[in-house]
């Protein structure tokens, strides 16, 4: 019997690269995505298209309301998504696009799904560039959540270890794109933008777009998605 894996899938290049990596193993894949605000609704639409390229046993989209977490540009309509011209302008501290406890919420859902379906492996696409800005993307956080998962679940208490996998944790965005291209990821079906237009164009100026464009440029490859 195949082992089961839960993958957090956002529709961006990082989680899609993780999906590609896991798809080349013997895991039976259960993908989990979240619809939490209008600004990420396009991500959910994109996922429906890209997931058809993979042998995914089940894909769940969880609707959750994170708008009560005011103070983040990704959940608060009163805060504009910051725009930049290049990587030199990107913030070195925690940006306003940080969503309080987001990965803790997402991983908690993934943990619940894993217990229900009998999975012991959870995959997430955090990486080096992420944990420069987002505290819930750091290696220490991943290790701590894994420790909590094994203390707070029936399977963990019974000695069936739950593992949180972050296969990109030591990679930069540039290295992730390089790896994905080598594996054959179709990045035209992904989106990174924090502030896309209603017709699906990426803004090209938010933190995520700037980082994505820079990663493709460093790989001497044209980003296949459309920008404003």
UniProtKB/Swiss-Prot annotation:
Cofactor(s) listed in the protein's UniProt record: Zn(2+)
GO terms, biological process: queuosine biosynthetic process
Family that this chain belongs to: Belongs to the QueC family.
EC class of the enzyme, as a word: ligase
Superkingdom as given in the UniProt entry: Bacteria
The keyword ATP-binding belongs to this UniProt entry's keyword annotation: yes
EC number, UniProt record: 6.3.4.20
The name this protein goes by in its record: 7-cyano-7-deazaguanine synthase
UniProt keyword list: ATP-binding, Ligase, Metal-binding, Nucleotide-binding, Queuosine biosynthesis, Zinc
Residues involved in Zn(2+) binding: 193, 203, 206, 209
Source organism (scientific name): Rickettsia africae (strain ESF-5)
InterPro entries: QueC, Rossmann-like_a/b/a_fold
Gene, per the UniProt record: queC
Pathway assignment: Purine metabolism; 7-cyano-7-deazaguanine biosynthesis
